[in-house]
């Protein structure tokens, strides 16, 4: 899309037609949040004479490369908020409204802007993730080159008139598959030239391990590098953040331009491994009374707690406190993976869960009735502990 599209036109393209319904999707409770309406009036005027979904799609198609409604539908389903699903237009409209409402709160100074340096929002790229992305880049290059060679031989090779495509591959396979793009790419990457494209080039990914001592080698293996130029005159990313307590060593950082950019993991910190959010969503649907967004009413949206998994609004739930305590018990007993992050944002009434990889996690003690687990009478009598007990 070559230009910005007015908010209400995007909402109508997603199937939310009336102005009142669009404002309900944004504010949820119009009576309670009536003071926000004045700030949405310019959006109503920006929509002009576009009052139907068809007109909205016709308007958007003028700013696209394809110039067709089917091309616009492809963008809305595959590229607009892709984490919400492909054809879930109502869910995408609700999520767009949720984002606009959050932006209005920040604009009116009712909430602070998102702290981009908070480790809640940071993800660590481990060697496995870096290798996967590198392989994907060179695999796509190799695939493109093979297809190009096949096309040249099929359409332009003199003397080839066979309609059977398999015969072409069998007779020319040595030449078609001669280039070893993936192998050569990995060789270049491990010599320091990491990345296949100019915009994916990285410096400092491959380093010689410091083995002066066991401790220095261990520290070097747990080193984190913020992808910023050491000459950048920015202060906030270099400062200590309260969210790094127990995750990042507050002392072990070099002097000079790299101060605060090169960090080291704390001794007990780990990096989470990912698992599918749909496994957790399937578990919630069978064990909790969770309501799907496409079946929810405006009354449900006003009064029920939102459930977010990996940043995607997945549904609504009625009893967040009880659900949170049950989820924590399931997590402690290993019924759901122990590295699942679960929190309840009481102010915004959102139950957040994360299953993605790269999150920094650390062990904590369980406290029941203001007593930590290692002070219980049973363990004192026995005199020994296991990790499961703690």
Q: How would you label these PLM feature ranges?
A:
Residues 1-219, 227, 241, 266-269, ...:
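N-terminal non-catalytic structural scaffold regions of very large proteins
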Residues 249, 263-264:
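Short beta-strand elements
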């Amino acid at each position: 899309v070559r230009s910005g599209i007015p908010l209400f036109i995007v909402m109508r393209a997603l199937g939310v037609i009336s102005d009142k319904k669009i404002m309900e999707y944004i504010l949820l409770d119009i009576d309670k949040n009536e003071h926000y309406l004045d700030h949405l009036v310019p959006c109503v005027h920006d929509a002009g004479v576009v009052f139907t979904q068809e007109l909205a799609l016709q308007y958007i198609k003028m700013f696209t490369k394809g110039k067709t409604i089917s091309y616009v539908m492809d963008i809305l389903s595959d590229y607009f908020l892709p984490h919400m699903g492909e054809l879930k237009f109502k869910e995408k409209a609700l999520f767009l409204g949720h984002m606009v409402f959050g932006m209005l709160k920040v604009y009116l100074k009712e909430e602070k802007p998102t702290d981009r340096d908070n480790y809640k929002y940071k993800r660590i790229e481990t060697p496995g993730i870096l290798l996967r992305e590198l392989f994907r880049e060179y695999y796509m290059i190799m695939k493109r080159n093979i297809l190009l060679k096949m096309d040249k031989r099929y359409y332009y090779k003199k003397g080839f008139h066979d309609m059977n495509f398999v015969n072409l591959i069998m007779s020319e396979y040595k030449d078609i598959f001669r280039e070893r793009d993936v192998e050569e790419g990995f060789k270049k990457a491990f010599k320091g030239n990491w990345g296949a494209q100019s915009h994916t080039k990285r410096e400092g990914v491959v380093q010689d391990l410091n083995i002066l001592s066991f401790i220095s080698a261990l520290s070097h293996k747990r080193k984190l590098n913020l992808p910023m130029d050491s000459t950048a005159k920015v202060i906030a990313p270099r400062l200590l953040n309260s969210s790094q307590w127990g995750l990042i060593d507050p002392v072990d950082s070099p002097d000079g331009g790299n101060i605060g950019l090169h960090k080291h993991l704390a001794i007990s910190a780990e990096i989470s491994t990912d698992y599918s959010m749909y496994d957790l969503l399937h578990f919630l649907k069978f064990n909790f009374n969770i309501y799907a967004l496409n079946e929810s009413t405006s009354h449900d949206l006003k009064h029920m707690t939102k459930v977010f998994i990996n940043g995607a609004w997945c549904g609504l739930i009625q009893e967040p406190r009880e659900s949170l305590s049950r989820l924590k018990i399931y997590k402690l007993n290993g019924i759901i993976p122990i590295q699942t992050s679960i929190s309840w944002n009481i102010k915004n009434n959102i139950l957040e869960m994360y299953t993605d990889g790269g999150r920094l996690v650390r062990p904590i003690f369980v406290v029941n009735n203001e007593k930590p687990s290692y002070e219980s009478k049973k363990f004192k009598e026995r005199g020994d502990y296991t990790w499961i007990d703690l």
